[in-house]
Swiss-Prot record:
Residues 61-65 are annotated as: G2. GTP hydrolase that promotes the GTP-dependent binding of aminoacyl-tRNA to the A-site of ribosomes during protein biosynthesis. PROSITE patterns: G_TR_1 (PS00301), G_TR_2 (PS51722). This is Elongation factor Tu. The lineage of its organism: Bacteria, Thermotogati, Deinococcota, Deinococci, Deinococcales. It is an enzyme of class 3 (hydrolase). One of its GO terms (cellular component) is cytosol. It comes from Deinococcus geothermalis (strain DSM 11300 / CIP 105573 / AG-3a). Mg(2+) binds at T26.
Amino acid sequence: MAKGTFERTKPHVNVGTIGHVDHGKTTLTAAITFTAAAMDPTVEKLAYDQIDKAPEEKARGITINTAHVEYNTPARHYSHVDCPGHADYVKNMITGAAQMDGAILVVSSADGPMPQTREHILLARQVGVPYIVVFMNKVDMVDDEELLELVEMEVRELLSKYEFPGDDLPVIKGSALQALEALQQNPKTARGENPWVDKIWELLDAIDAYIPTPERATDKTFLMPVEDVFTITGRGTVATGRVERGVCKVGDEVEIVGLRDTKKTTITGVEMHRKLLDQGMAGDNVGVLLRGVARDDVERGQVLAKPGSITPHTKFEASVYVLSKDEGGRHSAFFGGYRPQFYFRTTDVTGVVELPAGVEMVMPGDNVSFTVELIKPIAMEEGLRFAIREGGRTVGAGVVTKVLE
């Protein structure tokens, strides 16, 4: 199976469809799999109903329905997520269950931007989806060229309003349904053989060109959340955890950040499954031996990080999804002054919620932004995910949108 190994050399990019209900996200997702499969038989073709009955998965204690599809373009390998319901999108984007390197915003040309179009763009901005490509769907239902131009202008303005480069990003006009039907009639429809299928290729070209290949986790600065600490007699203190990003090796200086004053130390050993390693890298579960650090100097909930790369903070703004009662969340609203636990990486820290002006209370099932002040500092940066818990049970999920102090 030489082919399988060859595919793996392509850069991997995570994308997803976003946009208003019934604007054609799932139909487009199906059309993309059929288009890619016409060129590459290893791609699994998925019909609308196979994608629509998305399996449930759990992320940070929250149940989300998400469909995952995969496909190749000549340049890349893509993982693509599509969610059946609006609430699933909100939960998905806030928990980071499906991290997106870029999103395909689907807008019906017949309707133009709708409330969820705006909401998904805002969410993409808040949770840090860096790039958006637009697919104006259902152009076969619009006879008036001027109307199409008007919708395109509206979409570009809306994106600019939320600080995406609305004037410059790609907008592809097509019909996912027409493309899908053409491919269902002739699954081998190649590029250049059908104008609707060509529009899907145009979209794939646009995501290839416009969404940059993400920096690999191993190329980023080192960070490891501490899960456990123990002492090896005669050797010193070991912190264990899964390396979140970057690489660590013997001799590297690191800082221990969060919960107390930042402390600098040097790595004197890295091991995995009781074997010594040259280096630990993103994704590895490792034990890191730290020079001159007492057993009580480091604890679960702190992080080991490259010096100067991350700082401890107590106050931040967040975008939050509050679980509904049916999802096992609270049964009643909460108000300003609410004091739950905020679970960051490996530990809970109590914090106080301050609601924005004009917001009296927050109901279960709401998506809301507010400010939090923690009683202890946590190593924090924008884009960091957390869960909100009461007595160990998850009642919400959030993402840090702005670090305040």
